[in-house]
Amino acid sequence: MYVNITNLGYKQGGSTITQQLAKLIFFNAEKSIIRKVRELFITFKLEALLDKEEILSLYLNRAYFGAGNYGIKSAANSYFNIDPYDLSIYESAILVSALKAPSRLNMMSSPILTKKRASLVLNKMLSLGLITKLEFEDQSFKLESFKL
């Protein structure tokens, strides 16, 4: 936001999950300073009313995952034919990897790039202590073995 204001225009993204949620719910994809300021006010309101889990849940239930899939339920069903609660760690990494650029980083349009990005997600999960080394190795093997 600072870069955008100091350059008097829209130069960079870098939105938080809450800002992305605000944009999904209230605004279109128009890139303007006015939209970003409005988005910022909505973001503050969302963060005051909801906890992080609620914000993440709302975001994942509305986000675009590529190949016509809006929301984690649609994506899990379309890509893996399962409910989101049944996703494995590597399947979750595949879906999360699509969020950066869903039209380009999804299993249908770019399976090799999707696997590379999902591998980065698994590495990040390991470095943050969200999964153990054993889980990382197991899920990385399953990811590499998975036919996209």
Regions picked out by a protein language model, each given a short descriptive name:
Residues 1-7:
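Extracytoplasmic strand-loop-helix segments at the start of, or within, the mature domains
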Residues 9, 17-19, 23-148:
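Non-catalytic, structured segments within soluble enzyme domains
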